[in-house]
């Protein structure tokens, strides 16, 4: 089974944790000084926030798989569709060790597809990144970061809805 993933940048982690805990009706499954994550079952989502990265907003979207086989299936589908992907293999990021790759949609939004292998005690275990990359939400400095998902804080005069 797969799980939808969202990672957002926040300025104030404690305030955001309080908000999302109330919204989800659940406490985070992991909390660190710069990061929190909820593994919600209904709807099935891995929702993460961190103080790392650029301006507040959605950093990237993703699909987390429960098995290595599901990740292989997603990767095969992407390759069959001639999608350019960056396979970073096994990597450590966001307090977890995962096998992952990245895609960027036609609008420039980054998508992470990954299978979590286990938890780690630090945000990332990779070598120090170049200037500007050290605070990125996702530790794969060479990943196609795409552009942030712009979500208006105040409604515009003319709004669209799904």
Q: What is the meaning of each model-derived region?
A:
Residues 5-7, 37, 60-62, 100-102:
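Short aromatic/hydrophobic contact patches that present stacked aromatics
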Residues 32-35, 55-57, 94-99:
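Short acidic/glycine-enriched loop/turn segments that link adjacent beta-strands
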